[in-house]
Design a protein with these regions (language model features):
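Conserved N-terminal beta-strand and adjoining loop/helix that marks the start
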Residues: 1-21
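Short, hydrophobic/aromatic-rich beta-strand segments within well-structured domains
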Residues: 12, 21-24, 88-92
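Short, solvent-exposed coil/turn elements at secondary-structure transition points
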Residues: 31-34, 64-69, 107-109
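Nudix hydrolase/Nudix homology domain
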Residues: 26, 91, 96-124
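Active-site segment of metal-dependent pyrophosphate-handling enzymes
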Residues: 52-96
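Aromatic-acidic/polar surface patches that form glycan- and anion
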Residues: 4, 32-36, 102
C-alpha cells in the first residue's frame, strides 16, 4: 500500500512498504491541493517551492485521494468553500540521496503517534 496515511495530531506518514515509513522533515513529500488546482498544477507549485533544495529532483506520484475536511485544522479548511466535505491530497517523492533520519520502521512510527496522543491527553 503506497501513498499517504493520515495519523492524528498532524503527523503524516508516507508508507513505503510494509515495514518502513518516511517522516517528512523540511522536505514536504505531500501537499494539500488548492482551489482549482489539478495534480499537474500542484506538482509545478511544489517544484517551485522546493527549488534550490539541492537534495534531488522532485517527482510527482499519482493523486492520493480526498480526505475528510474535519481531519484538518481550521487554518487549512478556511482556505476552502464552506460547503466542501473533502480536501484533495497529493503525494510526492524526492529522487536522489535519502537522509536516513527520515526513515523509520512503521511500528516505531505508530508508537510515536500513540505517545503523542497520550501526552496531549495528559496535559488537557
Amino acid at each position: 500500500m503506497n501513498g499517504i496515511q493520515y495519523e492524528s495530531f498532524g503527523v503524516y506518514l508516507v508508507l513505503l512498504d510494509e515495514e518502513y515509513v518516511f517522516l517528512p522533515s523540511s522536505r514536504l513529500p505531500f501537499s494539500l491541493g488548492k482551489k482549482g488546482e489539478n495534480p499537474q498544477k500542484c506538482a509545478l507549485r511544489m517544484k517551485r517551492e522546493l527549488t534550490g533544495d539541492g537534495e534531488g529532483r522532485l517527482v510527482s506520484l499519482p493523486y492520493v485521494g480526498r480526505m475528510d475536511k474535519d481531519l484538518f485544522p481550521s487554518f487549512i479548511t478556511s482556505l476552502w468553500a464552506p460547503g466542501i466535505k473533502t480536501i484533495p491530497v497529493y503525494a510526492f517523492k524526492m529522487e536522489g540521496e535519502r537522509k536516513e533520519r527520515d526513515w523509520i520502521r512503521l511500528d516505531e512510527a505508530r508508537k510515536m503517534v500513540e505517545k503523542a496522543e497520550k501526552d496531549v491527553l495528559f496535559f488537557i
